[in-house]
Amino acid sequence: MLLPWSWGYDKPDNIDDLYRLVGSVLTTFLLIIQIYLRVAEAGNNALYAVHQKTYKVGCIPCMLYVASGGSLDWTLGDLGIPYSYGMELRDTGAYGFLLPPEQIIPTGEELWAFHLTVAREIIKEFVP
């Protein structure tokens, strides 16, 4: 499970709405990170429940490497989508970015469980 930003170690600062509600940059920053991680962990637990495949949760440079120009940077930075997540597929490196056919459907099932859970968690967090 990958969280923005991929271009560096900075944490996302989509704090405008939350800043008005909470009242301080530090509290807001911590709240954003807590919400991101809580939602990501809930999605990750849903992934695991499908086929008991373990995924890690963390920022891209912390888990992989610094990489600019990724879709997470674009969706959060340019489009302002506050819950921007990415996935590294379930293969552990033997096939690169090409999953073997027998891993495609299980990966799709895991990703469906993740996205459904993340959507529910976001609704629970923000819809009265």
Q: Which residues are covered by each model-predicted region?
A:
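C-terminal accessory segments enriched in acidic
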Residues: 1-128
